[in-house]
UniProtKB/Swiss-Prot annotation:
Protein name listed in UniProt: DNA mismatch repair protein MutS
Domain of life: Bacteria
Residues noted as binding ATP in the record, renumbered to the chain: G625, P626, N627, M628, G629, G630, K631, S632
InterPro entries recorded: DNA_mismatch_repair_MutS (IPR005748), DNA_mismatch_repair_MutS-lik_N (IPR007695), DNA_mismatch_repair_MutS/MSH (IPR017261), DNA_mismatch_repair_MutS_C (IPR000432), DNA_mismatch_repair_MutS_clamp (IPR007861), DNA_mismatch_repair_MutS_core (IPR007696), DNA_mismatch_repair_MutS_N (IPR016151), DNA_mismatch_repair_MutS_sf (IPR036187)
Family, as annotated: Belongs to the DNA mismatch repair MutS family.
CDD domains reported in the protein's UniProt record: ABC_MutS1
GO BP field: mismatch repair
Keywords: ATP-binding, DNA damage, DNA repair, DNA-binding, Nucleotide-binding
This protein's record includes keyword DNA repair: yes
Molecular-function annotations in GO: ATP binding; ATP-dependent DNA damage sensor activity; damaged DNA binding; mismatched DNA binding
Task performed by this protein: This protein is involved in the repair of mismatches in DNA. It is possible that it carries out the mismatch recognition step. This protein has a weak ATPase activity.
Annotated gene: mutS
C-alpha cells in the first residue's frame, strides 16, 4: 500500500494536480528517503508534512496543523523549533525512528526565489554520535546479521566509540543470546522470510535488500574501506558469514553518514570460547542491569558501578555482559584491584577522574569533525590530568597497571596545543565566537580589537549626538536584521538632524543612520565576519592537528576507562567487604559466607551469609524449604559471585574458590522478586530443554521449581527426570530448588549407588505464635516442612480460606496416597517422604507420627498435630 506522501507525489508526476514549488521541493527530498521522517528546514522550524507530520505529532505529542493547500488538498504539517530540535530528535531515535535533516543551503535573504535545500545528515538509532542523542553510560550499537545454512554472521559497530566487531554463531538460540548481550539500537537484516520469532516486532529492525549481504561484496568493501589487500590480519578471512554482515553494516554506515569514518581503524573477531556463555533467559533471570519487570534500579550493575567517567561505565557494562574465561587476564585484574587497595591509590585515581570527561566519544567527534568547542576544552583538561595519573601509577607493582600506565602515552605536545589555542571556557557553538584563546593568533587578536573598540566608539557617538541634537533620550543600538542605528522616540523625531537618514519605523520610535555610523558599521561588521572566519579556519586546523594523534589518544582513553573500572572495583571491595576470589584449575565451586550483592545492598536487616561446596563428587544440591525462605536468592547469589569473579571484581564472600566455568544457565520461573506468574509451562520447558542440550561438566546451572506449571504428578515426574539428566548425563554444577520433597531421595540413591554426586540442603523457618520467621540459613539435609499455609496467611489470605485449606490438606493427606505411589514407583518416591500433599504412606497415621519431633513443636503445633492424627484414625 502506498503512503499518502507517495500518492501525493504520484499525483504531481501524473499531471493530475499541480503542487506548489515548496511542495515539489519537499517531494523531491522525500523521494530519496521514503522510510525516514524528513525534517524540512523552514526558517526557525523543522517542518514535517503529510504522513511524517501525522506520525511525528503522535510520537512527540506536538500539534498537527495544516499549511495552506497544495495539489488541491490541505497539507498536514507539524514542526519543531530549530533551537530545541535535538530533544525531539533524541525522543524519535529512542523510539527506533530514523530522521533525514534537510537544511536550507546558503542565506535565505540572498536567495532569488525558492531557497535551495539539501539533506545534509541522516540520524538513525544505531549511527548517532551527537552527545545530546546518546546515553552516556550505555553503548549505542548498530548490528547487521547475515545467515547461511551453517548459521549466522554478526557484525556490530559502536560509531560513537569507534569499535567494530564481528562474530559467527551456529544457531538461532546463540543468535538470540548475542542480541540479548549486545542490545543493538538498530538491527539490519536481509529482507527475507523465516527469521526467528524473537526478531519480529523488535524496535529498530531495518530490512535491507538481500544482495547487500553478500560475502564477496562484503570482502571487497572491507578491503577498500581499510585500504588492505587481505583480511587475514583481522582474523576473518575464513568467516564468510561474518564478512557478509560486516559489509552490509559498513555500506549502511557510509550511506547514512555521508562522510569518511577515520575513527574505525580495524575490525575485531570475538572468540566465543574466551567468555562464559549466558543465554537470553539467564541474563534476564540474573537481572544484571535490568530487572525482569523492566526497572533498572536494584540490579547487579547498580550495586557494582562505582565508575567516575561515562566511558568507564560503558566498559564495565561490557565486562558484566561478557565474563571472561581467560584465567591470566582475570588474575591480572584481581591483582590490580588488590594493589590499588593496598596502596590506597584507588581514591586518588577516582578523584583525578572526576575532571576527566568522556574522552572516548570526544575523540570520535574529533575524527568526524563534528567536535564542539567544549569538546576541545574537556579534552584539554583531561590530557592535563595525565601527569597526575602517571605519578599515581608509577610505583604500583602490578603487571596490568603498568601496562595501562604505558598505554596512557605521552601527549604533552597535544595538551600544550589545546591549552594555548582554546579559551578557558569556550562558548557552546563556534558561531558564537570566542573559542580560540587570546594570544594564539595575532591576526585574530587584531580583528577582535576592532570589535572590542567598537563598544567604546558607540558610547562616544551616542554622547556626541545627544549633545549636538539636544535629544537627551537618543540611543545608539544594533540588531542583526537592520544593523546599527540611532533611535529617537516618536515625540522627538521632528528634532532629528537633516543628515540623519531614516532606516526603520517602529510603533513608538524612528531609527536612523548617518554616514559616520554607516562607515563604522561596514568596518566593524567586516571585522566580526573576518574574525569568525579566522576562528573557523583555526578551529579546522586544530581538528587537523588532533587527527594525526587519534590512534594514541584512543589508546589513552581506553587505558583510562579500564583504570576507572579497576579503581571502582577497589572502592566497592572496601565499601562492601568483598574478597579476592581464587581461580582454581581443578573442578570446584567453594564459597564461604557468600552473600547476594543486590539483596544485601537494599535490605535494612543484616544479610545471612551461606556456604556452597561443589566439586567432582558433589555436583548437585537439591534445595528444599518454604516459599520466601530464600532458595532463589541463594542460587542466584552463587551465580553472581561466579560472574563477578570472571569480570575481574572481588566478590561478596569471605572466600571463593572457583574452578573452570564455561556457562551459566538458569531456569527461574517464579520466586522472590521475579516475574509474577507470567511464565508459561511452554516457556519453562523450552528453557529447560536448552539447558539439558547445552550444559557441560563445567557449567553452572540454576533450576528453580521445575514442573510447577503443570499438574502435580506431571510436574513431579518432569522434575525428577530433569534432575537425573543434569546429575548423570550433563554432570554439571547444579543448584536445584524444588517444592517436590520427593526429590530429596535422589541423594540417597546417589549414595547407595556409590556416586555421591547429589546432596540435600534446605532453608528453614520458625513459628513464633502467629509469626513465621524465615531463617535464610542453608543447612544440610532436606526440609521437613513446607510452611505453605503459613506463607499464604502472611500474604493476606482471609483466615477462613486458610482454615479451609488446613481441612483440605488433612483430607488430601488421608486419601491421596495409593494412586500416587502406583504412578511413580519405583523412583525417588520410594524413600521416606515428607508428611504433606504428596505423601503416600501405607499407614498415614503411623507415617505422620514418625515425622513428628516433639522437641521442635510449639504448643500450637502440637495441638494441630494431634487433630491431624485423630482425623487419620
Amino acid at each position: 500500500m502506498q503512503s499518502t506522501d507517495t500518492k501525493e507525489k504520484n499525483k504531481n508526476a501524473s499531471g493530475a494536480v499541480e503542487h506548489t514549488p515548496l511542495m515539489k521541493q519537499f517531494f523531491a527530498a522525500k523521494s530519496d528517503y521514503p522510510d525516514l521522517l524528513l525534517f524540512f528546514r523552514m526558517g526557525d522550524f523543522y517542518e514535517l508534512f503529510y504522513d511524517d507530520a501525522r506520525k511525528a505529532a503522535r510520537l512527540l505529542d506536538i500539534t498537527l496543523t495544516q499549511r495552506g493547500s497544495s495539489g488541491g488538498a490541505p497539507i498536514p504539517m507539524a514542526g519543531v523549533p530549530v533551537h530545541a530540535y535535538e530533544g525531539y530528535l533524541a525522543r524519535l531515535v529512542a523510539l527506533g525512528e530514523s530522521v533525514a535533516i534537510c537544511e536550507q543551503i546558503g542565506d535565505p535573504a540572498l536567495a532569488k526565489g525558492l531557497v535551495e535545500r539539501k539533506v545534509v545528515r541522516i540520524v538513525t538509532p544505531g549511527t548517532v554520535t551527537d552527545e545530546a542523542l546518546l546515553d552516556e553510560r550505555r553503548d549505542t550499537l548498530l548490528m547487521a546479521i547475515s545467515r547461511s545454512k551453517h548459521g549466522y554472521g554478526l557484525a556490530w559497530a559502536d560509531l560513537a566509540g569507534g569499535r567494530f566487531l564481528v562474530n559467527e554463531v551456529d544457531s538461532a538460540d546463540a543468535l538470540e543470546a548475542e542480541i540479548a548481550r549486545l542490545e543493538p539500537a538498530e538491527l539490519l537484516v536481509p529482507d527475507e522470510d523465516n527469521w526467528p520469532d524473537f526478531l519480529r516486532g523488535r524496535t529498530g529492525v531495518r530490512r535491507r535488500p538481500p544482495w547487500l549481504f553478500d560475502a564477496d561484496s562484503g570482502r571487497r568493501q572491507l578491503l577498500a574501506f581499510f585500504k588492505l589487500h587481505d583480511l587475514s590480519g583481522f582474523g576473518i578471512d575464513d568467516k564468510p558469514c561474518a564478512t557478509a554482515a560486516a559489509g552490509a553494516l559498513l555500506g549502511y554506515v557510509e550511506e547514512t553518514q555521508k562522510q569518511r569514518l577515520p575513527h574505525l581503524t580495524s575490525i575485531a573477531m570475538e572468540v566465543a570460547s574466551e567468555a562464559i556463555s549466558m543465554n537470553a533467559a539467564t541474563r534476564r533471570h540474573l537481572e544484571l542491569d535490568t530487572r525482569v519487570d523492566g526497572d533498572t534500579r536494584n540490579t547487579l550493575l547498580g550495586v557494582l558501578d562505582s565508575t567516575v567517567t561515562p566511558m568507564g561505565g560503558r566498559l564495565l557494562r561490557r565486562w558484566l555482559h561478557r565474563p571472561l574465561r581467560l584465567r591470566d587476564v582475570l588474575l591480572q585484574r584481581h591483582h590490580a584491584v588488590g594493589t590499588l587497595i593496598d596502596a590506597g591509590a584507588d581514591a586518588d585515581l577516582r578523584e583525578a577522574f572526576r575532571a576527566l570527561g568522556d574522552l572516548e566519544r570526544i575523540l570520535t567527534r574529533v575524527a568526524l569533525r563534528s567536535a564542539r568547542p567544549r569538546d576541545f576544552s574537556t579534552l584539554r583538561d583531561g590530557l592535563a590530568l595525565l601527569p597526575k595519573v602517571r605519578t599515581i601509577l608509577a610505583p604500583l607493582d602490578s603487571p596490568r597497571l603498568q601496562t595501562l600506565h604505558a598505554e596512557l602515552g605521552e601527549h604533552d605536545a597535544t595538551a600544550h596545543l589545546l591549552i594555548s589555542a582554546v579559551a578557558e571556557t569556550p562558548p557552546l557553538k563556534l558561531s558564537d565566537g570566542g573559542v580560540i584563546a587570546t594570544g594564539y593568533d595575532a591576526e585574530l587578536d587584531e580583528l577582535r580589537r576592532l570589535s572590542t573598540n567598537a563598544d567604546q566608539f558607540l558610547i562616544d557617538l551616542e554622547q556626541r549626538e545627544r549633545a549636538s541634537s539636544g535629544i537627551a533620550t537618543l540611543k545608539v543600538g544594533y540588531n542583526r536584521v537592520h544593523g546599527y542605528y540611532i533611535e529617537i522616540s516618536k515625540g522627538q523625531a521632528e528634532k532629528a538632524p537633516l543628515h540623519y537618514s531614516r532606516r526603520q519605523t517602529l510603533t513608538n520610535a524612528e531609527r536612523y543612520i548617518t554616514e559616520e555610523l554607516k562607515s563604522f558599521e561596514d568596518k566593524v561588521l567586516s571585522a566580526r565576519e573576518r574574525s569568525l572566519s579566522r576562528e573557523k579556519l583555526l578551529y579546522e586546523g586544530l581538528l587537523d592537528a588532533l587527527g594525526t594523534e587519534l590512534e594514541g589518544l584512543k589508546r589513552c582513553a581506553g587505558a583510562l576507562s579500564e583504570l576507572d573500572v579497576l579503581a571502582g572495583f577497589a572502592e566497592r571491595a572496601q565499601a562492601l567487604d568483598w574478597s579476592q576470589p581464587e581461580l582454581d584449575h581443578a573442578p570446584c565451586l567453594r564459597i564461604e559466607h557468600g552473600r547476594h550483592p543486590v539483596v544485601e545492598a537494599v535490605r535494612e536487616q543484616p544479610f545471612e551469609p551461606n556456604d556452597l561446596d561443589l566439586h567432582s563428587d558433589r555436583r548437585m544440591l537439591v534445595i528444599t524449604g518454604p516459599n520466601m525462605g530464600g532458595k532463589s536468592t541463594y542460587m542466584r547469589q552463587n551465580a553472581l559471585i561466579v560472574l563477578l569473579a570472571h569480570i575481574g571484581s572481588y566478590v561478596p564472600a569471605s572466600r571463593a574458590v572457583i574452578g573452570p566455568i564455561d556457562r551459566i544457565l538458569t531456569r527461574i520461573g517464579a520466586g522472590d522478586d521475579l516475574a509474577r506468574g507470567q511464565s508459561t509451562f511452554m516457556v519453562e520447558m523450552a528453557e529447560t530443554s536448552y539447558i539439558l542440550h547445552h550444559a557441560t561438566p563445567q557449567s553452572l546451572v540454576l533450576m528453580d521449581e521445575i514442573g510447577r506449571g503443570t499438574s502435580t504428578y506431571d510436574g513431579l515426574a518432569l522434575a525428577d527426570a530433569v534432575a537425573r539428566h543434569l546429575a548423570h548425563t550433563n554432570r554439571c554444577y547444579t543448584l536445584f530448588a524444588t517444592h517436590y520433597f520427593e526429590l530429596t531421595a535422589l541423594a540417597d540413591e546417589s549414595h547407595a549407588g556409590g556416586a555421591s554426586g547429589i546432596a540435600n540442603v534446605h532453608l528453614d523457618a520458625v513459628e513464633h505464635g502467629e509469626r513465621l520467621v524465615f531463617m535464610h540459613a542453608v543447612k544440610d539435609g532436606p526440609a521437613n516442612r513446607s510452611f505453605g499455609l503459613q506463607v499464604a496467611a502472611l500474604a493476606g489470605l482471609p483466615k477462613a480460606a486458610v482454615t479451609q485449606a488446613r481441612r483440605r490438606l488433612v483430607e488430601l493427606e488421608q486419601r491421596g496416597g495409593e494412586s500416587h505411589s502406583a504412578q511413580m514407583a519405583p523412583t525417588a518416591l520410594d524413600a521416606p517422604q515428607q508428611f504433606g500433599l504428596f505423601t503416600a504412606p501405607s499407614s498415614a497415621a503411623q507415617e505422620a507420627l514418625q515425622a513428628l519431633d516433639p522437641d521442635e513443636l510449639t504448643p500450637k503445633q502440637a495441638l494441630e498435630a494431634l487433630y491431624r492424627l485423630k482425623a487419620l484414625l
